[in-house]
């Protein structure tokens, strides 16, 4: 399950609460696509996660890959807020596959991540 909200600054906040499902990415697209259509690129994404929860099926993994493929050029920055090793891996490896700048922040540093995305920190 993936809780998400898109704030008034164009920052998409993602909070995985369990294994990711195919429907999570359909719901995410319903939130993000109209914003991109009207406002342009997202300022950023904040992924606030204790540990990567995985996917509930191969279909969910494929939906995740499609979502990234279809949207990564429309996101300027990605902040990964976690104490898990995922943060370091995402910052070093994922940057080769997405257009956004990726930065790792320790758990609890969501406000610092927001400031970085907004160019204030």
Regions from the language model: what does each represent?
Residues 1-121:
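Amphipathic, Lys/Arg-enriched alpha-helical "gate/interface" segment within cytosolic domains
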């Amino acid at each position: 399950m993936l809780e998400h909200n898109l704030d008034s600054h164009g920052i998409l906040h993602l909070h995985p609460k369990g294994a990711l499902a195919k429907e999570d990415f359909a719901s995410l697209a319903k939130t993000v696509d109209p914003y991109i259509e009207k406002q342009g690129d997202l300022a950023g994404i904040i992924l606030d996660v204790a540990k990567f929860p995985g996917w509930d099926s191969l279909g969910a993994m494929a939906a995740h890959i499609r979502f990234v493929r279809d949207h990564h050029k429309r996101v300027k920055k990605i902040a990964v807020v976690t104490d898990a090793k995922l943060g370091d891996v995402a910052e070093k490896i994922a940057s080769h596959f997405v257009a956004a700048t990726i930065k790792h922040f320790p758990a609890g540093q969501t406000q610092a991540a927001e400031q970085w995305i907004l160019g204030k920190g």
